[in-house]
């Protein structure tokens, strides 16, 4: 966001002009949208443990074979690895939300994840279901209108959903 401000100021300075009303309005909108992003990321971060835990609980309720002997999340070590991976994915989704760009999610989290899971025998479809459950929970928490920046957040919530969808697709 600061790069955008610096760019506008540099352009005006190069022309020896004050910032125009149009430029100020665009920067004001950027700040407003940035505040919404901060609110969303703050809510997701503050509720990350509950988002991951509830998603895992729902996943294992729907797919109990995962936590039964021989299942991919059977034993405490495997369960901990599953929860850790879900938390990492949620963390990188939050980075993408704040940046407004999925490249950090792709580059640092998702690239190669499917292949890693396949090599380890982790069922990608089950991981995708867990990610979908995190998505539903995170959007419900982030979309709660109490105590956040007012305004229409439907476009931002749709964007948030796309980051989770990207992660779910990447592991299948």
UniProtKB/Swiss-Prot annotation:
SUPFAM superfamilies to which the protein is assigned, alphabetical: Globin-like
Key word Electron transport present: yes
UniProt keyword Cytoplasm present: no
Chain positions with N4-methylasparagine modification: 72
Binding site for (2R,3E)-phycocyanobilin 2: 72, 77, 82-88
Binding site for (2R,3E)-phycocyanobilin 1: 35, 39, 149-151, 153
Pfam families reported in the protein's UniProt record: Phycobilisome
PTM characteristics: Contains two covalently linked phycocyanobilin chromophores.
InterPro entries (UniProt xref): Globin-like_sf, Phycobilisome_asu/bsu, Phycobilisome_asu/bsu_sf, Phycocyanin_b
Keywords: Antenna complex, Bile pigment, Chloroplast, Chromophore, Electron transport, Membrane, Methylation, Photosynthesis, Phycobilisome, Plastid, Thylakoid, Transport
GO CC terms: chloroplast thylakoid membrane; phycobilisome
Compartment(s) of residence: Plastid, Chloroplast thylakoid membrane
Biological process per Gene Ontology, one example term: photosynthesis
Other remarks in the entry: The light-harvesting antenna system in red algae and cyanobacteria is formed of phycobilisomes. These are composed of the phycobiliproteins phycoerythrin (CPE), phycocyanin (CPC) and allophycocyanin (APC). Cyanobacteria also contain phycoerythrocyanin (PCC). The phycobiliproteins all share the same subunit composition and organization with variations in the covalently bound open-chain tetrapyrrole chromophores. Although originally identified as Cyanidium caldarium, these sequences derive from Galdieria sulphuraria.
Assembly and interaction partners: Heterodimer of an alpha and a beta subunit. Dimers further assemble into trimers and the trimers into hexamers. The basic functional unit of phycobiliproteins is a ring-shaped hexamer formed from two back-to-back trimers contacting via the alpha chain subunits. The trimers are composed of alpha/beta subunit heterodimers arranged around a three-fold axis of symmetry. The phycoerythrins also contain a gamma subunit which is located in the center of the hexamer.
Function: Light-harvesting photosynthetic tetrapyrrole chromophore-protein from the phycobiliprotein complex (phycobilisome, PBS). Phycocyanin is the major phycobiliprotein in the PBS rod.
Family the entry assigns: Belongs to the phycobiliprotein family.
The protein's name: C-phycocyanin beta chain
Organism: Galdieria sulphuraria (Red alga)
